[in-house]
Amino acid sequence: MIRISNYRKLILFGLLFLAVYILLVYQLLEYELLEGHSEIKSLSDALWYSIVTLTTVGYGDIVPTSEGGRIIGYIFLFLSLGVYGILIGQFSNVISKINENNKLGMQGTSFQNHIVVIGWTQFGKTVIDQLIRAGRQVAIVTRDRANIELLHELYDKRAAFILYSDYENLENLEKANINNCSSVFVNLENDTDKLVYILNIKKKYEDLQYIVTLENANLKQTFLNAGVRYAISKNEIASRLLASYMFEPDVAQYSEEILAYPVTDTDYDIKQFRVLSKNPFIGQEYDKTFYELKKTYNVILIGLVREEGDKKVLHKNPQDNFIIKEGDFLLLIMNMAAQKKINKIFSTKEGI
């Protein structure tokens, strides 16, 4: 059997009701004209009576006098109850459907320069939490409908957009405004699924920046060759930090705390800022910039990244005479109080 949508059913019901209504109006007029002394003498009178009856207004200025006309009057009266019930029910269904579509993300989002996260896991939650604390907007795509309620409870709609979609439906990612995102974090269950997904999604969205975490560090080059910008091994990072705790615990603790997002104005963090055309340090030597930032804002410049061709080259603690150029990314250690000043001086916010 062909499945008919609710909207098509509603249209068919409306046409059927209209046909029955017209038939009853003409039948009413016929009964009343045969009666001879009825107040319903024309089609307009019959229409007027039917309308005030169906809308339950019931002015009582004209009423049928024939037996057949009264029977039709009863039919109009009962129809009015049914029509109201159906209209209220259909209206409730439409509102419910709109709310459900909004909850599932079917209306799309207008987020710009946000992060799209494909897949929902407990590890992904910790990443998303950090991003939102940093003031970034996130679009989360999940194919598990059971996650939708939880995600809406966890995150404010101004910070996170939730999209229910099959991962294979790449067209649906347009609803997450993927073309205008800053990066895509592929957060699927295993490395094989991630690699297959990367190969498929890059056929449609080739120019986006993709990020993955790996269970197997040996696959890093494979993912880079597939077009991933950053492939990070969770085990590799954790093992380095753990080893550091074993022989230089203070360094390990410093590293862990400096990577965490600050909560108070006195908490420190490493941030990167792009050097825009209005940046006051363009054309200035590295050492002079270092001392000026430290003295004026209590900010430590620890390095910079420069785009050289298709690659980004990290310069850790460059030579003193290294000249800062527009488009560079300055890597800075600062607290939240200093960040507010740097945002204003650099005319930009942290990030890429």
Language model features with spans:
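Cytosolic regulatory regions of ion transport systems
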Residues: 1-22, 30-40, 52-55, 61-64, ...
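Structural signature of hydrophobic alpha-helical transmembrane segments
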Residues: 43-47
